[in-house]
A protein has these predicted regions:
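Nucleotide-activated sugar donor-binding and catalytic core shared by glycosyltransferases
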Residues: 1-125, 130-256
Length: 256
């Protein structure tokens, strides 16, 4: 819960609406359980299991280990061919409607600034198809030597790219849960998050869609190895990949 029906919209609205018509709630965290209790959901109908997205991530991450990048991706990201070269990738995803307009202008300015400050990094941005995203991104970032604007990726190659990345900069909710399981620090380009457990556990930094905050946060992680390791080694509060097993076990016992 963000407790703001408009941020993010429509996700926060959908979560609250679905909870009203749900009988059994398989909650990803203890904090999520507390949120449901505060909305008068019966304690007996809430089961803390972790999030099934981590189960899927772990499955796909194992597949990604033995699946090479396609020739098309290697063409777009030629530095991936240099497997013997130490490289740091900053992976970017951004699509939130809350950031349309001034927000994406600030985000793109921040990325441009970081690319100049750190010419040794590679910034990879699979650009969302929405024209409200593509226009400012292409206008402000096309042609920058170490910024790679590519088409959206399927899930398996995206997970493989997450594994290869050093830091992830995103406005996505799901990536806030997934990336910490891969040991990747996450900087979130939003002012609020429905995943406060990530912030509390130290796996996520909230920077907002603000140029100065984004630059400062990413630069700090790129230059301070201790700060980087602290985030990379923090425990993911969203589970260990066994949520589906726990859910199945509950359903089998409940409806036996």
């Amino acid at each position: 819960r963000t407790h703001d029906i408009l941020a993010p919209f429509p996700e926060e609205f959908n979560r609250k609406m679905i909870s009203v018509v749900t009988t059994y709630h398989f909650s990803p965290t203890e904090q999520s359980k507390k949120n449901l209790l505060a909305e008068c959901v019966n304690d007996k109908n809430i089961i803390v299991t972790g999030n099934t997205v981590i189960d899927s991530l772990m499955l796909v991450a194992r597949q990604a280990q033995t699946t090479p990048f396609s020739s098309d991706i290697l063409r777009q990201l030629p530095f991936l061919k240099k497997s013997n070269v130490t490289q740091r990738i900053v992976l970017v995803t951004g699509h939130r409607r809350e950031n349309f307009g001034d927000g994406f202008e600030e985000i793109c300015q921040a990325l441009h600034c970081l690319a100049i400050m750190h010419p040794d990094i590679n910034i990879v941005y699979p650009v969302h198809l929405n024209p409200n995203v593509r226009e400012p991104v292409n206008r402000l970032l096309s042609g920058v030597r170490n910024i790679y604007l590519i088409e959206p990726l399927d899930y398996l190659p995206f997970v493989k790219l997450m594994v290869e990345s050093y830091i992830i900069l995103t406005d996505s909710g799901g990536i806030q849960e997934e990336a910490p399981s891969l040991g990747k620090p996450v900087v979130v380009m939003r002012d609020t998050t429905e995943r406060p457990e990530s912030v509390a556990s130290g796996t996520v930094i909230l920077a907002g869609a603000n140029k100065e905050n984004i630059v400062r946060s990413i630069d700090h992680l790129l230059t301070d190895k201790s700060a980087y390791n602290k985030m990379a080694r923090a425990n993911n509060p969203y589970g260990d990949g066994n949520a589906s097993v726990l859910i199945r076990k509950y359903i089998e016992e409940r409806f036996r």
